[in-house]
Regions:
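Ala/Thr-enriched low-complexity intrinsically disordered regions
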Residues: 7-8, 15, 264
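A polyanion-binding, active-site-adjacent surface
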Residues: 11, 19-253
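Low-complexity, intrinsically disordered or signal/transmembrane-proximal segments
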Residues: 6-9, 258-259
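Low-complexity, Gly/Ser/Thr/Pro-rich intrinsically disordered linker/tail segments
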Residues: 251-263
């Protein structure tokens, strides 16, 4: 953890350049070149060398995984980090792993995705009014980034939300890690934080006022659709769809089940 924090002080700390990302496309390109956290770089590349048997024919992405979705989205979804054999393999967040299977099926069910499955970057999947991102863009060992790695990655997420700010009206926050990571990011991106800070819980809602010009932002907390949460029924498909619908409503998206996009 200490090493990751020291990394942020180096002149070549890649995320220092995040404010120069003038568009989400450019920011995504910049993110994919980052090698700031030695532990994460080693792990993502090791996972690509020692592949799971089911994916031995794959050429793994093995780089930081950027956000996915339109640049004018009124709704964002913030998760945790790419999975070693999911996003780290396919190059798209929540794609190719059980968490993504649950999330994209739910997004499709509420009318926010063009298809219920996500298998690879060229599968034709589109999101309607939603952008998905994470506080940590590299796959971490045991799906557990350190706080230092989270802080090193923070400028990327802050800049992404700044670029989304003209249209962003709501964020669905999946899991306690993302909930805890967001306050300094949101403050930097232009919203006021309530005091005391709200405690994470499934279904928790918080309305943030803008720090200056702009519109307020509603946060909707939800359990992360991890394999464990889904298998133990800590989170069910119905519960996941509910928080996504609430986020969509807060974002002004009129969802239409299954296909056609919002308002179809």
């Amino acid at each position: 953890m200490r090493g990751s924090r020291q990394t942020t002080q180096k002149p070549d700390f890649p995320a220092r350049a995040a404010p120069r990302g003038g568009s989400l496309r450019r920011l995504d390109e910049m993110i994919t070149t980052c090698r700031a956290c030695p532990r994460l770089v080693a792990w993502r590349e090791e996972a690509a060398r020692v592949k799971r048997r089911a994916f031995r024919e794959w050429e793994y992405w093995a780089r930081p995984v950027p956000g996915f979705g339109p640049s004018d989205a009124p709704l964002a979804i913030v998760g945790l980090a790419p999975a070693a054999h999911g996003g780290n393999r396919t190059g798209r967040i929540f794609t190719g792993d059980p968490s993504g299977d649950a999330l994209y099926a739910a997004l499709y069910d509420v009318g926010l995705a063009s298809r219920p499955t996500a298998t690879h970057r060229g599968d034709g999947l589109e999101l309607y009014g939603v952008r998905i991102t994470v506080p940590v863009h590299c796959a971490p060992p045991d799906n557990r980034p350190t706080t230092g790695e989270r802080d090193t990655c923070r400028p990327w997420l802050a800049r992404e939300l700044q670029l989304l700010r003209p249209t962003l009206r709501a964020i669905v926050v999946l899991g306690a890690f993302a909930w805890q990571a967001l306050p300094p990011v949101l403050a930097e991106a232009g919203w006021r934080l309530p005091r005391p800070r709200p405690v994470f819980g499934h279904g928790t809602e918080v309305l943030l006022a803008p720090a200056g010009d702009g519109r307020p932002l509603r946060l909707v907390g939800g359990y992360h659709p991890s394999r464990r949460n889904m298998s133990t029924r800590t989170l069910t498909p119905v519960m996941l769809r509910d928080v996504l619908r609430r986020g969509a409503e807060a974002g002004g998206l009129l969802t239409s089940p299954h296909h056609g996009g919002p308002g179809a």
